[in-house]
């Protein structure tokens, strides 16, 4: 993302006063947000990835409040990215908007064979998230299982069931279905 594109994105966020499926806003004028893990996970686990915009305050109607220290913010966000599995490689862009510094972190999508991306400190079942609208929600056991079975090439609908045999089939029902 170029600085001018970040400026346009900031204008759009301020105009719509909303986050979205691919946009998360964090104030960051008093320091780096402590917990980005849920957003890092949810953006990494969707095909489109996402963008975290630092320097707008949602509680003030998405007012530009700036970033406390651009260099330190990028360093600390990268530290949080390194605590994900697989590691997230954010792409940073900075710009000045209405006299304050704004920073974005583009979070790329993780290849589906490596999903779910999760926070190592919480483990796969508690640290995996999915994005729904503007919310980062914990993945269900089923969602995690779906990714894991995809990786293992498990096709539950094609697996033979050892305890099943032809005597369990309703021959008349099958004939009616086929004919």
What are these regions (language model features)?
Residues 1-179:
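Conserved N-terminal catalytic/coupling substructures associated with nucleotide/phosphate chemistry
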């Amino acid at each position: 993302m170029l600085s001018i594109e970040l400026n346009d994105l900031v204008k759009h966020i301020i105009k719509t006063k909303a986050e979205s499926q691919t946009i998360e806003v964090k104030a960051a004028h008093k320091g780096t947000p402590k917990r980005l893990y849920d957003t890092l996970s949810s953006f990494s686990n969707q095909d489109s990835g996402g963008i975290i915009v630092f320097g707008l305050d949602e509680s003030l109607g998405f007012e530009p409040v700036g970033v406390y220290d651009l260099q330190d913010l990028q360093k600390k966000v990268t530290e949080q990215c390194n605590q994900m599995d697989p590691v997230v490689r954010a792409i940073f862009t900075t710009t000045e908007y209405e006299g304050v510094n704004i920073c974005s972190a583009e979070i790329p999508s993780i290849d589906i064979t490596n999903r779910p991306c999760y926070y190592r400190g919480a483990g796969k079942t508690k640290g995996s998230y999915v994005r729904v609208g503007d919310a980062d929600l914990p993945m269900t056991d089923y969602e995690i299982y779906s990714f894991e079975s995809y990786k293992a090439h498990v096709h539950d609908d094609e697996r033979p069931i050892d305890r099943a045999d032809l005597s369990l089939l309703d021959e008349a029902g099958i004939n009616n279905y086929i004919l």
